[in-house]
Amino acid sequence: GTELDMSKDPGAGPHALPYRWRPMTWKYEGKPFVHERTTATQQTGFSFVAQARNWLPNPIGGIFWFGVDDAASTVYFPAYCGITSVPEAYAEGKGDMLTYCSDCAFWTFNKVSNFSYLRYDVMHAEVAKVQNELETRFISNTQLIDNTAKELYQNDPKKALQYLTDYSANTGNYVVNRWEKMFQFLLVKFMDGNVKQEENGVFKYNKYNLCPDHVNNPQLPDWWKKIIIDATGDKLVQPEPKK
């Protein structure tokens, strides 16, 4: 990174969190300071990428790639502009800012993002891996969906709209279900500050098949250790063993 990399200064903490919580402006010894804001922010309600293809019929040519919560950890799914209803998990009335909803997009994505902020350096890598996998799949499916919808549209526009509605709804709901599994995976793997061993999403048990195999505990970076030592002096120094 560069000197502008917000994951590298002490404000990021030992786990390289690029975000800075409010207040963004603050003072020290009477001098004003400001935290910079990342391109993707934690308080994002929703974001989208609008794709317009004028060579296709209007209901097919427009795609609203839609995602909720933090843009850096959301998954954008394709909502064709000709759909007649939205995925249930994204529908109005599914919880609100003060009412938790276990099967709606907003709260499911917030569970994952807010948990990953605790150990961003290791958790966000897991999030990004599945995020890229899903979005790559949706993008690669686009031409097939376009062609099928176009063929239906030529004969019966209503069938084409229903096809697109079903596809967008199923895709959006699938994303939320997959993200709930993402949260469960993160909780199991990173619970209590440990990192459990797994391979392709399958956790490893010890030889007794009762407890996890040996857990990993990544070291804190040296610069963070120095901050602790500078603040505590000799308080945390281990005494020499008695001979």
Predicted features and spans:
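C-terminus-biased signal that marks the final domain/tail of proteins
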Residues: 1-243
